[in-house]
Amino acid sequence: MLGIPGGLTCFPSSGVGALHTGTGAGIIFPWEDGLDLRLHQAARLGSRSMSAIVDFECPPLNEVICGLHFRRMDRFTAPYVGLLWQKFQTHYPKCEVHPPLTLVSEQDTELQLEMSSFPRVWFVSEDSTRLVQVQQDLLIHNWRQVESSTSYPRYKIVKDGFDDALSKFEAFVADHGLGAVEARQYELSYVNFVPQGDGYESLGELGRLLPDFAWRRNTSRFLPDPSNVNYQTVFDLPNNNGKLRVSIQDALRRSDEKKLTRILIVVRGMHQSQDVSTPDDWFELAHEWIVRAFLDLTSEEVQVKHWRKK
């Protein structure tokens, strides 16, 4: 479900469920299922600009995903894909076809899965760092790191790319009488990869990177250090605006057999309150929670020494 430097192969985990929005390539995940620790956040943190919260010179960020799941548009069928690509082709000259994705809604009290036989189409930029994914009930804009030298263009640019893609898609379906884009759920996801050696040398030392996931290491205990980890935690956003999910997994980069820890932070939901009353409000809230969650979860020593927190 990820996009990482090219030339790699991915065996995705079922980890966080819901929108499976990443771009796949490059990482092996040993686990299929994980420990589900359900935690809850009581109140919204005070509002501050992201620049006032944090800035890293070398962040471990690998991919950012902005997505919208909408009511399925059955009239948007295969013949329209080529016509839609024409609207994107100037900035996304490459096109790929992939199997459709499934939504698991954070808003429903009961688990609801919807499958479609219609494929998912990728419109990919020339340098492969940006892509738009479209299917009958889904639109996603991704930024991904394809080379180690590729720098993150900042959240606003990724969000602007999503807004532009959504505007083009809404105009297209209106022009062709395919129906309206009825939003059901938004998503913002950040994917980070931290190599072993950046503050920790093994999974037994994972607490030096992620203090909440420390492994007790002493000679009197029976169990050795873990060989694999797959932790998941869930936090409620305020006023029923959605959930924040954190997934911690060990992984292996195929290109150099480097051991990594993936920190995936996903927020899904809808604007449900007076202070979060528009899609832009919701994405701002989601972005704030992701940034603050990352700071809260990771050790300050690693933030300063390895990611060069300013």
Q: Which role does the model predict for each range below?
A:
Residues P119-L131, V181-D256:
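Aromatic/basic-lined ligand-recognition segments
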Residues P60-L68, V132-P153, V181-V191, K259-Q272:
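Glycine-rich, often proline-containing surface loops adjacent to acidic residues and nearby aromatics
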Residues I27-I28, E32, D36-Q41:
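Short, positively charged and aromatic/hydrophobic N-terminal segments
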